[in-house]
Amino acid sequence: MAHKKAGGSSRNGRDSAGRRLGVKKFGSEAVIPGNIIVRQRGTKWHPGTNVGMGKDHTLFALVPGKVQFETRRGREFVTVVPLAQAAE
């Protein structure tokens, strides 16, 4: 009787590349319009003031300013405080 399994082709050994999701600009970092703030699947973070959302739920800056993360009504929001207000 053979004590070893016959060597065949393995059915494992595949993996997909990481999707590079996550926060790209952290709290109080400076951004310009079009800068990506968060790449995400679904709405873990919601767009706040001066932040737009792409069709893949990517959040991006609409005005130059500083990034701010905040929780309102049990949801996490990302806002951009415009430069004029951020300086005050």
UniProtKB/Swiss-Prot annotation:
Keywords attached to this entry: Ribonucleoprotein, Ribosomal protein
Q: Which InterPro entries match?
A: Ribosomal_bL27, Ribosomal_bL27_CS
Query: Does the record's keyword annotation contain Ribonucleoprotein?
Result: yes
Q: Which Pfam families match?
A: Ribosomal_L27
Q: What molecular function does GO assign, one term? A: structural constituent of ribosome
**GO terms under cellular component:** cytosolic large ribosomal subunit
Q: Which family does it belong to?
A: Belongs to the bacterial ribosomal protein bL27 family.
**Know the name of this protein?**
Large ribosomal subunit protein bL27
**Organism encoding this protein:** Methylorubrum populi (strain ATCC BAA-705 / NCIMB 13946 / BJ001)
Q: Name the gene for this chain.
A: rpmA
